[in-house]
């Protein structure tokens, strides 16, 4: 018996000899056949695993966070331009005859010129497969943003150079810190009058509590904006203003900091100022440390102008090198490795009626490990059942494309017949681990919902329940009542408008919303506490959520403190996990 001369794959063979009994020859050939099958299977498995690892290492999945109007949507579209996913950028406006941003697809978004849902956008650039989780920038749609951040491996924080850190940015930043994910800062709108860049860095460090490391540095701002200095390359990229809706920016002219042409190009005053600021940065600013970036303790900072496409390509190149491919994710059985483990994912978003004509419901899943293949059977852990994921697709805002495969780091949408909930784990049959739950954040505004046409009770209950399951609103009931009286809680008041709009346009139900005087809600942490025995002031209201968990509504923080001082056995939580 000897190896064949076919080097790939390795095979073994045997030659028949007249002295060998035929039965023994057959036995040997059968054993050799089994060995060859095992060798081929092992080699094939290695090839497949190598391909999976190669695809996963190309993935970069990140969210973009910002305060409203900081330029997040514009930056997102310029990324797509460089990736070839779109040809022109649409400017988000409220007029019916205006172009709309690719990432804004719901009718109410197009009418108002805002993003109210999270979009998932995928494109290829420079050998990477990039997944952008484009989140609502409007202050009234932060809860969907919170959940989307749970699916991201890193975040790009967009800051308006004229305003610095704003309220919405602070809220979203806290979620990133909670997850310890890398945070990259893009200070936008440098072509407009802006604050001093040193003030902006100080603002980020003092307000957000994270160290900063400028990768490039602006030369002037507004009408005197001349470009940015690359601290690593020691060159200046000269600013060129182009059409705001155009394709890629013109090639940037790079000049060395000691090049005589640079002083002529930007003027002597700005040149001297640049030299002083670079010297100050080199002596006083934080040094770049990849380990601190990975821990979310140091934020690399970039300056540019998304509207004029200046600094976008430079940012992309740096960002893709500094951020990592999908990392192991926590579960109740420990860390799940994205490469060595088979397919697994978790649901972070549910969206109904993305196609009004089909009344569909899509569950968005972040793949955490392995490879997904269309038609594969998976195990739904929370449902304790095997399930085929039907109609797998990837999204480019409202556009869908059916897919055959996807890898760790990707986000896919699958048809949901009503069995999935936010936070559910999906994995390969034989596995039963659960990924960490996604927090439900406390709403800050509450209304009593009154149905105007009682003949459409069935449609009303179906519609409001489905919208709640998507996570757009939270439904509460009187603690001792049923669905007769429904209280809706939202993170931002504009979500009430979305609720009314969707119930009327998608379910044909008109409602009236009656504001309630409560601003805080807390979940009861200790299940043994009997909320029915609690008799307190009229400043609180006892309710329960859709799963029967007890909660208390408060008018102010003083009510919370007084109740906890009086009820020593009562424990409250600001959020709960699904």
Walk through the language-model features, giving the residues of each.
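Short, positively charged and aromatic/hydrophobic N-terminal segments
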Residues: 8, 15-26, 34-41, 45-46
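Intrinsic disorder/low-complexity signal
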Residues: 10-11, 20, 139, 398
